[in-house]
């Protein structure tokens, strides 16, 4: 299923000022590794901004939570500590249910359906973000999600008590319904959490599996 979307956010005031100001330098925190396709896409965005502004707006990309951790990025942009950032917005669904619009299981099960869902939600999402002083710049869907475990899973009983990495309210609820223990872990911390046993299972895309070399810690997808 297509279960989550990563968004690029900026402060409305700074975005408006950036077009007129010369030689602006911005920081853009991203939660994912440098070779993750969301980060690669963000770098293409940064390069395009530099080109179309003739170098008057130069954005430095900070990958893998190196400037701000994933759960700090949205707030950092709101407070002006970062002028722009990319964030998995469904992680903030507890703040406003609109932010979790794309995390309902099986609501969108293809990229086309994900695009349609994004378009349907855009107006309401923009309104909520604007009220917080934020502007939505672009959104990118993740590939289909799957469950990663370190053992065969034949029934719900096999999942009982497993520490499960959750990244939003929906994945925490999935864990609870399956009898697992939801544990909030950001993407940049996932590899260490798996290696140290802080979590022993999670739901994510094949892209994340490659980023984190999950086969070194888990055995079943």
Predicted regions mapped to residue ranges:
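N-terminal signal peptide c-region/cleavage motif recognized by signal peptidases
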Residues: 17-19
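Secondary-structure junction/capping motif
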Residues: 3, 36, 123-124
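N-terminal secretory/targeting leader peptides
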Residues: 10, 23-113, 127-221
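Signature of the catalytic double-stranded beta-helix
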Residues: 115-127
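Hydrophobic helical h-region of N-terminal Sec-dependent signal peptides
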Residues: 11-15
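Bacterial N-terminal signal peptides that target proteins for export
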Residues: 1-8
